[in-house]
Amino acid sequence: MSAQNLAPPLNTLDFDKKPEETRVVVAMSGGVDSSVVAGLLKQQGYDVLGITLQLYDHGAAVHRAGSCCAGQDIDDARRVCETLGIPHYVLDYEKRFRETVINPFAESYVAGETPIPCVSCNQTVKFADLLATAKELGADALATGHYIRSRPNPSPEHPGRRALFRPADADRDQSYFLFATTQEQIDYLRFPLGGLPKAETRRLAEEMGLVVAKKADSQDICFVPQGKYSDIITKLKPNAALAGEIVHLDGRVLGTHEGILHFTIGQRRGIGIATGEPLYVVYLDARSRRVIVGPKEALETHRVYLRDVNWLGDETLGEAASGEGFACYAKVRSTRAPAPAVLHVDATGTYVDLTVGEAGIAPGQACALYSAPGDDARVFGGGFIERSEREPAAEASLKALLASPVAA
């Protein structure tokens, strides 16, 4: 084959053209990770644009260490872009962020769930709205500072298709929060930090002379001042702070509480009752404002039913998970390693059987699915947990209690 018939070499982002002919929008939060992404792409010769979304402006949160996308962060992103010599734009997404992230977060707590607003933010504001803006600007890709990998996974029908994989730095793995990323979004997104350890990212930031090189990582829920989410929920949804009963699984009323928003499933400390036996929150009955408690074994869960499933396998979900199911690995908490599981789809819904079992699973949490337990495992998507099934005795007691009338 002659040289002129060879395909042009791929650049580092898997495009068949030179970096200087490839426009990339970088989502810049004002933190070290996205700043290093912009710096790396600039060094490699790409046509780089930095965009920062102003998502909220809640007083104390604006200057709180470890916040994201507020006043100080926007200024940090601007200064980084000045250092790198790239254009920087700020888009006001406060209204959109409130509608798609903050309000649903509060509503989820009122419903007795344990929501994950980072998933909603990635799903809507960052990977839907910002991605559309990047396309309007003529960009070939949207790059972010997330710790996750994507690689080409072409098919005859979709030559540009890509797949997601866990990152090299397992301690920084963000795949759990990205399970809802759609296939169309994955094909357009790029994650340059997926193969780097966090320590190397810090080193690169210092080498580039970036003002954010020693900046603290974002922590907890970015839009909540001082990390007190109950203040936000009470303000948006006053009914969440209404008093109710604390009830044992066996039906005994043990005391009262000042609002279900102060409790999470699996909680032991701070329940506010003393019975001489260790008790845990096993269910939040939002309809009747009851906090239901029981022994630790009542938290054990082996099956979770999912809603809003985002499937990223090569087959359709029905083809992969019908019959005997789809053997995979699942994470129901961001800090846990993926554990053996089987995904099923049948007339009762989409559900995951957890081989080992897990304690304290709450509605609203995510269940992310993987090909293997270790680093570099492929991400198959996942869903939000709609409900779970406990061990039989606890499940029967809970159903009987929920079916019983509540005293006026």
Curated annotation (Swiss-Prot):
GO biological process entries: tRNA wobble position uridine thiolation
Family, similarity comment: Belongs to the MnmA/TRMU family.
Gene3D superfamilies, sorted: Adenine nucleotide alpha hydrolases-like domains, HUPs, Translation factors
Annotated spans, Interaction with tRNA: 172-174
Pfam families on file: tRNA_Me_trans, tRNA_Me_trans_C, tRNA_Me_trans_M
Species whose genome carries this gene: Rhizobium etli (strain CIAT 652)
Catalytic activity: S-sulfanyl-L-cysteinyl-[protein] + uridine(34) in tRNA + AH2 + ATP = 2-thiouridine(34) in tRNA + L-cysteinyl-[protein] + A + AMP + diphosphate + H(+)
Keyword Nucleotide-binding appears in the UniProt entry: yes
Alphabetized SUPFAM superfamilies for the sequence: Adenine nucleotide alpha hydrolases-like
Disulfide linkage: C121-C222
Top-rank lineage group of the source organism: Bacteria
Record's protein name: tRNA-specific 2-thiouridylase MnmA
Keywords: ATP-binding, Cytoplasm, Disulfide bond, Nucleotide-binding, RNA-binding, Transferase, tRNA processing, tRNA-binding
Active site positions: C121 (nucleophile), C222 (cysteine persulfide intermediate)
UniProt-listed Enzyme Commission number(s): 2.8.1.13
A GO molecular-function descriptor: tRNA-uridine 2-sulfurtransferase activity
Compartments where found: Cytoplasm
Predominant place of localization: cytoplasm
